[in-house]
Amino acid sequence: MIWHVQNENFILDSTRIFMKAFHLLLFNGSFIFPECILIFGLILLLMIDSTSDQKDTPWLYFISSTSLVMSITALLFRWREEPMISFSGNFQTNNFNEIFQFLILLCSTLCIPLSVEYIECTEMAITEFLLFVLTATLGGMFLCGANDLITIFVAPECFSLCSYLLSGYTKRDVRSNEATTKYLLMGGASSSILVYGFSWLYGSSGGEIELQEIVNGLINTQMYNSPGISIALISITVGIGFKLSPAPFHQWTPDVYEGSPTPVVAFLSVTSKVAASASATRIFDIPFYFSSNEWHLLLEILAILSMILGNLIAITQTSMKRMLAYSSIGQIGYVIIGIIVGDSNDGYASMITYMLFYISMNLGTFACIVLFGLRTGTDNIRDYAGLYTKDPFSALSSALCLLSLGGIPPLAGFFGKLYLFWCGWQAGLYFLVSIGLLTSVVSIYYYLKIIKLLMTGRNKEITPHVRNYRRSPLRSNNSIELSMIVCVIASTIPGISMNPIIAIAQDTLF
């Protein structure tokens, strides 16, 4: 009898929770319509996988890509709408959040074609891979719109858990297992430090969790200049630093890049930085409004260390993925300049513009790495020697993306860096911009070294891996090459049409 009553109470409680969730979704669903599209895509993937056989795998890719494209379309239709706060203040929609969500969706849309042939060749589980990618994308989108401390913690954990699973997806690979272990341990430690910083903010503001209410609470309690805020600032900087992976919080990056499946690395290398940058700008700019000098100093130190260490250590690398890992550490140093400049002097606009170009440059380079790895089974930089003689398209595409990463005119990377450094110079960050210019010259050296290997035509320098390289026929419609074409175009053409891109980026205000 007691069990029967308890069972009825459980059913009633579950029904109330479900009805409350349905009520929230019904009245607030329009605010998260792009996210709802991804959720429905996830449900469809599960239904198709459980009711069909392996022959229906093209449908899985189609549903994943379609849900991402539809989500992008929904975001574009919502552009320029008035800022709105929904879900009892937990979520905010405005142009600033939406452009970061667009960048995350764009990354995921380009990464799925990169993964098709890789998954088929390595015989990885397709459905789970796509589920993790879409769920990580969903977590990144919620993080961009998060407006309170709880959502800011839960959303990146959703992204991080999927990232851990993706990095260890090739369970039989020892390097993949090692990468996952390091990633998980350091990710758990950083999350703990982040929560510790949030607890100081929560206590100092008098129990507030919404970002703007925290500012009001700090004013009411007169705690905005207290030592507790300094502790919160340092702890939150460390926690977010793990997601952005600037020096000295970069230790996990090279090992995870080298050990994880290459399409996963391509996905993580851009989406994690976009989502973390969106979160960092809101956290530093709103709750720490009264401590702007302190967090500016912290970020300047991180930017200098990242630009110097990342680019110098990248020179010594022999693996393409490890080289790009250290290159990404240097690149995030450039992005931090935009965060420091802030909304004044177009700092955020320059950061968004550069991140858009960085996505295309980075994914285009990873597309070549995925293709070369599938054809040869190697990742060593020296083994790329003479690739132009066997696959001119792949070699030229990789060369263009690397030149754009180095900031060579008239490619997109040059104009992105020029705009970013110019905004930093106008804001008075002369030393920081000077370091950025010098380290950009250093980066050009190791990018050109790789390009020289790609273009060499002397038989004695062509490696056995390239001699045995088999290019896929044009009629096979290789999805990797499709992504590569899109990324190469985006890495070159936008350089001569910067004004519309900058105008859109400047329209992103809190």
Curated annotation (Swiss-Prot):
Localization: Plastid, Chloroplast thylakoid membrane
EC top class, as a word: translocase
Superkingdom of the organism of origin: Eukaryota
GO biological process, one term: ATP synthesis coupled electron transport
Transmembrane segments: 24-44, 57-77, 99-119, 124-144, 149-169, 183-203, 229-249, 295-315, 323-343, 354-374, 395-415, 418-438, 484-504
Signal peptide start-end: none
A single GO molecular function term of this UniProt record: quinone binding
E.C. no: 7.1.1.-
Single GO cellular component term: chloroplast thylakoid membrane
Alphabetical UniProt keywords: Chloroplast, Membrane, NAD, NADP, Plastid, Plastoquinone, Quinone, Thylakoid, Translocase, Transmembrane, Transmembrane helix, Transport
Main location: plastid
Membrane topology of this protein: Multi-pass membrane protein
Pfam assignment, any one: Ndh2_N
Catalytic activity annotation: a plastoquinone + NADH + (n+1) H(+)(in) = a plastoquinol + NAD(+) + n H(+)(out); a plastoquinone + NADPH + (n+1) H(+)(in) = a plastoquinol + NADP(+) + n H(+)(out)
Assembly description: NDH is composed of at least 16 different subunits, 5 of which are encoded in the nucleus.
Family: Belongs to the complex I subunit 2 family.
PANTHER family xrefs: NADH DEHYDROGENASE
Function noted in UniProt: NDH shuttles electrons from NAD(P)H:plastoquinone, via FMN and iron-sulfur (Fe-S) centers, to quinones in the photosynthetic chain and possibly in a chloroplast respiratory chain. The immediate electron acceptor for the enzyme in this species is believed to be plastoquinone. Couples the redox reaction to proton translocation, and thus conserves the redox energy in a proton gradient.
Official protein name in the record: NAD(P)H-quinone oxidoreductase subunit 2 A, chloroplastic
Name of encoding gene: ndhB1
